[in-house]
Amino acid sequence: MVAKQESVVAPQVDVSKWSGKELELGKKVNEYAKSLATFKYPFFIPPPYPPAKPNMALSTQVNKMKQTANEAFKRKKYEEAKKLYGLALQLALNRCTWEPSILTREEASVMLCNRAAAEIALSQFPEALADANAALKIRNNYGKCYYRKAKALEAMHRIEEAKQVVRDGLILAEPVTRNELVALWASYTEKD
């Protein structure tokens, strides 16, 4: 659908009562105003572009790769799951810059968080911590990431840091993603 262009009417200045320099200046102003009226975009400023639509084919590929990785994780094929989450992350990060960045952030944070889960299952705790940290930098209200970060810290015997991560998660995480954090906090308070 082509946008309808409205015609711009150049204002007219009555210069019949002017003399000398005023007359010359008035004519120049009139000529300039008329010339602007002929431009498609006055002052050479085009209208804003419509919002970009996300590449749905890429979203489909990312989701299929994530589902395949989730299935591998359920079958306890953690190395395969880690690799597939990494590939899905690469796909998500290959979005064009004009696409909505919120979609890239959402997909990337989920892939990093899921890869952290696979790394925890593989006892690759520093890698899991790095992925959880990266996911939280992208999306700081993602409760599962706080949980995974705390579990990685706990596995590395950094209990006080893990407790602080759980506290932070309980404050910052979305309510729907807090359940695991509540259970983890309960387990920490029972030990004390």
From Swiss-Prot:
GO terms for molecular function: Hsp70 protein binding; Hsp90 protein binding. GO terms for cellular component: cytosol; nucleus; Sec62/Sec63 complex. Keywords: Cytoplasm, Nucleus, Protein transport, Transport. It comes from the Eukaryota. Gene3D superfamilies: Tetratricopeptide repeat domain (1.25.40.10). One of its GO terms (biological process) is protein transport. It is found in: Cytoplasm; Nucleus. Component of the heterotetrameric Sec62/63complex composed of sec62, sec63, sec66 and sec72. The Sec62/63 complex associates with the Sec61 complex to form the Sec complex. Acts as a non-essential component of the Sec62/63 complex which is involved in SRP-independent post-translational translocation across the endoplasmic reticulum (ER) and functions together with the Sec61 complex and bip1 in a channel-forming translocon complex. A cycle of assembly and disassembly of Sec62/63 complex from sec61 may govern the activity of the translocon. This is ER protein translocation subcomplex subunit sec67. The gene is sec67.
